[in-house]
Amino acid sequence: MTHNHDPYSDAKELAGLTLGKATDYQAEYDASLLQGVPRSLNRNAINLTAESLPFHGADIWTAYELSWLNAKGKPMVAIADIQLSHESQNLIESKSFKLYLNSFNQTKFDNIDAVQKTLVQDLGECAQGQVTVKIIEPKSFGIQRVVELPGTCIDDLDIEVSDYDFNPDYLENSTDDKQIVAETLNSNLLKSNCLITSQPDWGSVMIRYQGPKIDREKLLRYLISFRQHNEFHEQCVERIFVDLKHYCHCTKLTVYARYTRRGGLDINPYRSDFEHPGESHRLARQ
């Protein structure tokens, strides 16, 4: 269970981030612009250790504003799909990622493979973990799809809400042990706030589980309770996963959130104890 105490207020690892500060934009390649945040900051607070994580998965990023110069100086553009392993020591702070990608804008690369290899090397070094990068060229833009999350949307439930403070206790006594089900639910009402700037982060979340049937109204109240909660996207998804395992006793569980983009980047954390992410397709709000 993950009650809302603040593990971040004294975290020296956050003090040096460019996030929330005035920033000069560099247009020439500089890998040092990337900044990582230790995953342990959040995981310690929800009683997780790197040696015994209850899930696997990835932080799935889409970079829509990737541009560089080819060997002749002509601008090139692409989209990048990036997957960062859940086992990496650090998550990548998104503003630093944006600044890093901007540094490609006036930098010459011999070919697209050189761009891909540079991204893999730099992101892996910052995150201290495994990274995969797929670069999508303009000739393939037309096949990029907009999809809906799988499952049954719970947002039309007619509930009255007056409390918007994060509270995992909404999941207390939320299951029916006499009904063992396998189902997929989703909501577009996920909103949290940036840990540093408190800017709103808008997202949709899919929950696929097997186990005692979860009361959908209680689940929706729980998700709505993130509305004024300050935490990075990746941390929110891991918190949801841990809370559902604790309160709802899911025997199998996947939590997959897709957040709207900011600065040309969207972040889509995926955590599961029984399946792996498939192709990454954006939602309408992304």
From Swiss-Prot:
Its EC number is 1.7.1.13. NADPH binds at residues 94-95, 262-263. The active site is at 194 (thioimide intermediate), 201 (proton donor). Pfam families: QueF, QueF_N. Pathway: tRNA modification; tRNA-queuosine biosynthesis. GO terms for biological process: queuosine biosynthetic process; tRNA modification. It is found in: Cytoplasm. Substrate binds at residues 92-94, 233-234. The keyword Plastid does not apply. Keywords: Cytoplasm, NADP, Oxidoreductase, Queuosine biosynthesis. GO terms for molecular function: preQ1 synthase activity. InterPro entries: GTP-CH-I_C/QueF, NADPH_dep_7-cyano-7-deazaG_red, QueF, QueF_N, QueF_type2. One of its GO terms (cellular component) is cytoplasm. It catalyses: 7-aminomethyl-7-carbaguanine + 2 NADP(+) = 7-cyano-7-deazaguanine + 2 NADPH + 3 H(+). Catalyzes the NADPH-dependent reduction of 7-cyano-7-deazaguanine (preQ0) to 7-aminomethyl-7-deazaguanine (preQ1). Belongs to the GTP cyclohydrolase I family. QueF type 2 subfamily. Homodimer. This is NADPH-dependent 7-cyano-7-deazaguanine reductase. It comes from Shewanella sp. (strain MR-7).
